[in-house]
């Protein structure tokens, strides 16, 4: 497991907040609704990485960063999800992080979590299209549309999943829980460079994240400071090297 990274002089471990009180946590991750699909067999197909999180948390920026960091070493492609537009796919194409034919856009037409969990057909079709277009594809990043803290990927779509939150939502976000925060294979706390401006206490935020997630990893990052997301990129490399399919 990748050691948790931080940009601040605080300790990531432990249960204390550092501000003298604790918050009651009531969310039980075992109470989440069952996955309607179950784990998809790997076979010889590409590894599928889901990236989810609330609107504006930095999912597309992280996707772009991973493409920049991994594109020269891994045969990869991307599927984006938006409700009515192709905005995220267009952003990635304009940024030039991948050849344009390696980016597919899904327009969900409904709540984003529906297309990544309840009915994954459109996303699977997009993934299969990319695999047919690019034989030997090793990694497909599936970026969800912005949703709430309950949005998680079906294991029938994503072999492993990253959930992205950001400090602009306040340091209360991790302790609010929800399946995205508590069960994703990696939690990324993004935009840590803004913590002081928005009054977010990073020590509180990270301690709460670890308490909610147990042994599951947490990474803090600022893509302004580290545009290629080195810690998340290293974690993805570990998943690929291990051929990890969590829950299989």
Curated annotation (Swiss-Prot):
This is Urease accessory protein UreG 1. HAMAP family: UreG. The keyword Nucleotide-binding applies. GO terms for biological process: urea catabolic process. Belongs to the SIMIBI class G3E GTPase family. UreG subfamily. Pfam families: cobW (PF02492). Residues 1-14 have a biased composition (Basic and acidic residues). InterPro entries: CobW/HypB/UreG_nucleotide-bd, P-loop_NTPase, UreG. One of its GO terms (cellular component) is cytoplasm. Facilitates the functional incorporation of the urease nickel metallocenter. This process requires GTP hydrolysis, probably effectuated by UreG. Keywords: Chaperone, Cytoplasm, GTP-binding, Nickel insertion, Nucleotide-binding. One of its GO terms (molecular function) is GTPase activity. The keyword Transferase does not apply. GTP binds at residues 53-60. The gene is ureG1. Residues 1-36 are annotated as: Disordered. Homodimer. UreD, UreF and UreG form a complex that acts as a GTP-hydrolysis-dependent molecular chaperone, activating the urease apoprotein by helping to assemble the nickel containing metallocenter of UreC. The UreE protein probably delivers the nickel. It is found in: Cytoplasm.
């Amino acid at each position: 497991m990748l050691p948790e990274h931080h940009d601040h002089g605080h300790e990531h471990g432990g249960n204390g907040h550092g501000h003298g009180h604790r918050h009651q946590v009531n969310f039980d991750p075992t109470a989440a609704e069952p996955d309607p699909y179950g784990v998809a067999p790997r076979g010889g197909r590409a590894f599928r990485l889901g990236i989810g999180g609330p609107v504006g948390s930095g999912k597309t920026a992280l996707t772009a960063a991973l493409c920049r960091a991994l594109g020269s070493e891994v045969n990869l492609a991307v599927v984006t999800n938006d409700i009515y537009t192709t905005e995220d796919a267009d952003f990635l194409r304009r940024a030039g992080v991948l050849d344009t034919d390696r980016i597919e856009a899904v327009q969900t037409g409904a709540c984003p979590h529906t297309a990544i969990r309840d009915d994954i057909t459109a996303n699977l079709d997009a993934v299969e299209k990319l695999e047919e277009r690019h034989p030997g594809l090793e990694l497909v990043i599936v970026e969800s549309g912005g949703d709430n803290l309950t949005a998680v990927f079906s294991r029938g779509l994503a072999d492993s999943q990253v959930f992205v939150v950001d400090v602009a939502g306040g340091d209360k976000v991790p302790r609010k829980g929800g399946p995205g925060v508590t069960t994703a294979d990696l939690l990324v706390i993004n935009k840590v460079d803004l913590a002081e401006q928005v009054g977010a206490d990073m020590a509180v935020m990270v301690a709460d994240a670890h308490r909610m997630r147990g042994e599951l990893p947490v990474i803090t990052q600022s893509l302004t400071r580290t545009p290629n997301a080195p810690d998340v990129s290293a974690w993805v490399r570990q998943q690929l090297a291990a051929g990890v399919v969590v829950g299989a």
